């Protein structure tokens, strides 16, 4: 959260916002507390590109792109389970994903990000961060169908970058 606060306080960011400068994209990390970038993209009239360095599908990224994230065949990476999950493992995976996404992330983390945005953009009315997140045009993920999640359906705007080596 402190990194977002420092970024939104930075002189160059403030200048770009005041000048009404337009950008093509704003890249936002998929992990927690980077969601302030969604509102920054709206202010800069830019497309949102979500990137993830995790090797697993993240439920809120899948939700943002409108693609399925089914914990019955996509085990939660924080849990110990096999790819051939039992009913108990599937249930635990489902409950864990729900608590992480809706309890921790959507309620707690996004609440803190909203307070941060209120600090930097006082008095401005804005859509919810979840609504802004649904405007993401692309997701770049350091994942690969052969590791972690395995094969699962993804949209064309979800790009697996895993196992690519840039030299």
Can you say where each PLM-predicted feature lies in the sequence?
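Nucleotide-sugar-dependent glycosyltransferase catalytic domains
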Residues: 1-167
């Amino acid at each position: 959260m402190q990194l977002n606060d420092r970024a939104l306080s930075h002189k160059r960011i403030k200048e770009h916002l005041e000048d009404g400068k337009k950008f093509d994209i704003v890249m936002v990390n998929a992990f927690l507390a980077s969601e302030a970038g969604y509102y920054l993209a709206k202010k800069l009239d830019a497309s949102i590109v979500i990137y993830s360095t995790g090797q697993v599908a993240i439920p809120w990224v899948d939700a943002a792109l409108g693609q399925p994230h089914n914990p019955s065949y996509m085990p939660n990476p924080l849990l110990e389970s096999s790819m051939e999950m039992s009913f108990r493992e599937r249930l635990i995976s489902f409950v864990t994903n729900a608590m992480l996404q809706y309890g921790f992330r959507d309620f707690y983390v996004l609440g803190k990000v909203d307070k941060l945005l209120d600090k930097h953009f006082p008095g401005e009315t804005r859509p919810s961060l979840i609504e802004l997140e649904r405007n993401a045009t692309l997701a770049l993920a350091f994942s690969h169908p052969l590791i972690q999640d395995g094969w699962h359906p993804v949209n064309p705007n979800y790009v697996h970058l895993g196992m690519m080596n840039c030299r």
